[in-house]
């Protein structure tokens, strides 16, 4: 009887032990609908192109749409972890959603690779952000590129309008520092919501400040609204956008008014225009060719590249993690986190990654170029 009882207790206990699984499971949370859809749709498309095998293990990608809503992003993340037992979370597409997910990554000890831009997602690398990485360039890296270009063009004063959320605030914080270093003064700062349909009031205030240039700190198609409104009102200064607009949907919505606009971008956007010596060109062209073969010529967007790059990080980290533990276990997730943090000189479509315990983005100036919109096309500024 005692032996039978012990066997029963042992069997019951096994039900609560983490079970290794035969494949790597990746949960992907994207904003494929809602205000951020122009970012999330190319990422959703990219999810169909990802490798089915990594380091000899089959990979199961489970893709959910958070509708551009932070609450949904958190709910989706918990579902993927508790019900699907994923080893890695990739997402979300935008900063507010990704920031909301950071606590869940820390609580569950599941590594997360964000596809959003703000440095606040990964900085500082404290107990929470210990589990969080991201593939897009930090806004600080891109802000200095804009300030450098402004200074080279003799711009002394700037008006700024940005999203009334963490993306806009992060850009205001970082660009303020970059501008000050170049003796450029921000003479007015306005905010608007991603879902707003009019920014006339903000535009009138910007124009009253009479700046040499305007910087719009938005992402996706909603970033076109301030620029088109400024053009309608006759503002004739220089226009700058952030890397959050680097897709063809923005060009379609903004149209001719956006010709002449300058912005920093990951090198993927103009991969074909890069010199062959550029360390990102080969990866960028491979992604571009795969995407356009599936979805049509001219459809590639930088935002899809961030998902592609996240899986490149997984491909490089998984072999090391598999030496320690099997997928589906806390030990594997921890080993995978450690392996990602120790990646060095890994070329991705948006730069070359060198992670460290204090840097969970790992990108340097090789991860940015300046681009100008000319006749509705992206043109590398040389």
Named regions from a protein language model:
Residues 11-12:
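Repetitive helical segments and hydrophobic/amphipathic motifs
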Residues 17-19:
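N-terminal signal peptide c-region/cleavage motif recognized by signal peptidases
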Residues 4, 8, 22-382:
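Extracytosolic ligand-binding ectodomains
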């Amino acid at each position: 009887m005692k032996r039978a009882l012990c066997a029963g207790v042992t069997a019951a206990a096994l039900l609560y032990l983490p079970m290794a699984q035969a494949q790597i499971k990746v949960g992907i949370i994207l904003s494929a609908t809602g205000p951020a859809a122009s970012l999330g749709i190319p990422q959703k498309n990219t999810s169909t192109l990802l490798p089915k095998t990594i380091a000899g293990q089959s990979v199961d990608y489970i893709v959910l749409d958070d509708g551009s809503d932070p609450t949904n992003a958190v709910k989706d993340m918990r579902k993927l972890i508790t019900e699907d037992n994923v080893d890695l979370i990739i997402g979300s597409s935008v900063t507010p959603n990704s920031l909301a997910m950071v606590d869940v990554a820390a609580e569950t000890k599941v590594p997360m690779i964000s596809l959003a831009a703000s440095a606040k997602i990964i900085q500082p690398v404290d107990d929470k952000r210990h589990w969080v990485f991201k593939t897009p360039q930090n806004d600080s890296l891109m802000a200095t590129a804009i300030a450098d270009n402004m200074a080279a063009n003799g711009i002394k004063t700037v008006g700024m309008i940005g999203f009334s959320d963490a993306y806009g605030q992060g850009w205001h914080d970082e660009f303020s520092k970059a501008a000050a270093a170049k003796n450029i003064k921000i003479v007015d700062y306005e905010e608007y919501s991603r879902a707003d349909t009019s920014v006339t009031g903000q535009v009138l205030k910007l124009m009253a400040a009479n700046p040499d240039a305007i910087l719009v700190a938005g992402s996706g198609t909603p970033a076109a609204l301030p620029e088109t409104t400024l053009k309608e009102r006759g503002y004739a200064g220089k226009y700058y956008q952030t890397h959050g607009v680097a897709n063809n949907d923005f060009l379609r919505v903004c149209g001719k008014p956006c010709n002449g606009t300058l912005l920093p971008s990951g090198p993927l956007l103009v991969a074909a225009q890069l010199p062959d010596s550029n360390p990102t060109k080969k990866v960028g062209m491979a992604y571009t060719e795969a995407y356009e073969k599936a979805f049509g010529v001219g459809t590639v967007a930088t935002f899809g590249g961030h998902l592609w790059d996240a899986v490149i990080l997984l491909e490089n980290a998984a072999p090391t993690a598999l030496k320690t533990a099997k997928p589906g276990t806390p030990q594997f997730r921890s080993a995978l986190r450690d392996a990602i943090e120790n990646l060095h000189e890994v070329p991705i479509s948006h730069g070359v990654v060198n992670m460290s315990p204090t840097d969970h983005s790992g990108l340097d100036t090789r991860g940015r170029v300046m681009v100008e919109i000319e006749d509705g096309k992206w043109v590398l500024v040389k």
